[in-house]
């Protein structure tokens, strides 16, 4: 009897033709070349883990390693559009809910390995917006031990500059990948959970700004700063929040006049005497995290914002629909929405235990992983959206440190 978690094998001619065409397409579009120093692979299935700094990372991964046929683990968000969902099913992708336990997807991953086909997984769970690998859950080590397959890493460089999450408009430069063994099947079994997790962290780490310092490849285009205000909401000079604005290639503070510009290589530079601008986006984000840590350390911490609540109602799009208005409050223990939904008063309280991060659309809304229905919060001030997203992992960090 066929298991309800069974995964269909790839349609080999379709998969092979797709990956064959990928390399010339990616060269023409993004100047991508697959590395030549790919080590020999073992017979049977492997688990390929990828860094996730750009929206197209999976294409570069598939083009890098044509020796295996991969089932990509894809966020359930994309399946909410029926047409995209049909395409993902055609390519035998595995649907997974983001940042919460999903027993069904784990069963499908295990079934894939057992039938002899390989997996492509991005442990970060979503594209990070900084070009530097974001922390991810240690559950990936537990999953690797469950799957019992050789573990490899594919690191993508340049994908962040090509299509940054804060302004996903194509900027042609160059994309490169690296491929490396993380652990053999025997090592996956013998290493402790912590040892395996630390090895995964080390092999997956990517810093596109450090790579760019070495390569200095221009990623041209107009309005290079557009959208950065939704990520970099805190002024590094005066400490004002939600005061940053962008204009063309410049980012500035509407409160104190602090100003910087983004060059063709993606680096930031101060403009004018006295301006304080970090050279790299992830360093600016670290300033925001440090400020948030100080807020979260207070016993009465609460992040509050007027907002709209959204449900997913249209099966022909991944976008959500406003269905009410109220207030979102994030505390040490829960996210609360209080207001209206579909014309009726409502109160949702989501415990933070079990929610590692909020999936988000930068400058728009963040999703709330839960078992009730697809729910999103769209703050009225779009810049504070990023503060909610950054706060959740830091709350977990604070609680874990406090309880240690």
Where are these regions (language model features)?
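Short hydrophobic/aromatic-rich beta-strand segments that constitute the beta-sheet cores
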Residues: 72, 262, 335-339, 368
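Soluble catalytic domains of membrane acyltransferases
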Residues: 5, 10-15, 24-198, 214, ...
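Canonical pleckstrin homology
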Residues: 358-404
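Short, Lys/Arg-enriched, disordered terminal segments
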Residues: 1-10, 401-404
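A broadly conserved sequence feature marking short terminus-proximal activation segments
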Residues: 174-234, 241, 373-389
């Amino acid at each position: 009897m066929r298991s309800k978690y069974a995964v269909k094998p790839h349609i080999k001619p379709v998969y092979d033709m797709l990956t064959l065409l990928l390399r010339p397409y990616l060269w023409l579009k993004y100047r991508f070349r697959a590395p030549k120093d790919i080590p020999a692979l073992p017979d049977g299935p492997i688990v390929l883990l990828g860094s996730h700094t750009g929206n197209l990372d999976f294409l570069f991964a598939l083009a890098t390693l044509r020796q295996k046929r991969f089932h990509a683990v894809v966020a359930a968000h994309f399946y909410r559009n029926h047409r995209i969902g049909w395409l993902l099913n055609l390519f035998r992708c595995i649907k997974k809910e983001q940042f919460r336990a999903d027993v069904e997807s784990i069963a499908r991953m295990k079934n894939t390995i057992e039938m002899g086909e390989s997996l492509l997984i991005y442990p970060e769970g979503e594209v990070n917006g900084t070009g530097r690998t974001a922390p991810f859950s240690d559950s990936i080590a537990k999953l690797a031990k469950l799957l019992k397959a050789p573990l490899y890493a594919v690191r993508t460089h340049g994908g962040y500059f090509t299509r940054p999450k804060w302004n996903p408009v194509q900027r042609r430069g160059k994309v490169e990948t690296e491929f490396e063994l993380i652990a053999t099947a025997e090592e996956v079994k013998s290493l402790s959970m912590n040892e395996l997790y630390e090895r995964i962290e080390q092999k997956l780490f990517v810093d596109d700004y450090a790579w760019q310092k070495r390569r200095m490849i221009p990623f041209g285009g107009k309005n290079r700063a557009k959208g950065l205000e939704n990520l970099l909401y805190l002024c590094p000079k005066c400490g004002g929040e939600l005061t940053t604005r962008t204009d063309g290639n410049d980012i500035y503070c509407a409160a104190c006049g602090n100003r910087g510009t983004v060059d063709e290589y993606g680096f930031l530079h101060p403009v004018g005497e006295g301006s304080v601008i970090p050279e790299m986006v992830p360093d600016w984000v670290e300033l925001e995290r440090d400020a948030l840590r100080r807020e979260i350390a207070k016993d009465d911490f609460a992040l509050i914002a007027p907002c709209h609540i959204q449900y997913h109602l249209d099966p022909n799009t991944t976008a959500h629909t406003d269905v009410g208005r109220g207030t979102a409050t994030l505390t040490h223990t829960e996210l609360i929405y209080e207001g209206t939904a579909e014309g009726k008063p409502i109160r949702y309280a989501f415990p933070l235990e079990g929610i590692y991060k909020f999936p988000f659309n930068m400058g728009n809304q963040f999703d709330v992983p839960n078992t009730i229905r697809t729910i999103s919060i769209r703050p009225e001030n779009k810049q504070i959206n990023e503060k909610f997203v950054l706060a959740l992992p830091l709350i977990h960090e604070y609680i874990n440190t406090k309880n240690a």
